[in-house]
Structure formats: C-alpha cells, structure tokens
Amino acid sequence: MFAAIAVFAASIQGVFAQQTYEEMERLTVNEQVTTVITATEPIRFVDISTDKIAGDQPINNTIRLKPKEGAHEDGEVLAIVTIVTERYRSQYALLYTTRLQEAVTDKVV
C-alpha cells in the first residue's frame, strides 16, 4: 500500500513542478498597441509584477495591457502577468518589441 502511494506521488510530481521564466509563454508588447487577453471564464485575480505595464479589466473575462512608455530595448522583460480564474492560472512574460507588427493584440486563455 505504501509503495503504491510512493509511486503515485513520484508520478504526479512533474504535474506540480515549479514553472520558471524560461518555460513561460511570452507575449510581445509595444506602447502603441493594446494587448487584450480574454479568458474562457470570469477572471478572479490579475497580478502585474512591475509598474512598467498599465492594465485594467473592462469586463469580467477580459484584461487590457500596455507598456506605460516606450524607452525599452527589444526583448526586455517588462513584467510577468498572472491571471487566475476559478479553474486555472496562467502566467505570461511580457517582452517589449519596437516593431509594431510583432506586438500581440489578442490572446485567448
């Protein structure tokens, strides 16, 4: 019995493994483009890790993000955004781009 529990615990350990920045999905952002993130269910909580990004939640399943200013280098990490709903949590690294065509305008989670 105890051996079975130990095997089960070892097998699910990867499911609850810690995620690092390197493993996170990255969204490119630009101060001239609003990035809209839409969840499939109501968003309960949003955290933006720095004050370099402005954000709001105009409706219960949507957030809008935009860099506050444009004095950044290409590829610079401006923030990590965490989105929590009833059933899941998503995290994205927001990377600055000077090229408007690379900025993400819409993301569904």
For every predicted segment, state its role.
Residues M1-S11:
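Bacterial N-terminal signal peptides
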Residues G14-V109:
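A general "mature secreted/periplasmic domain" signal
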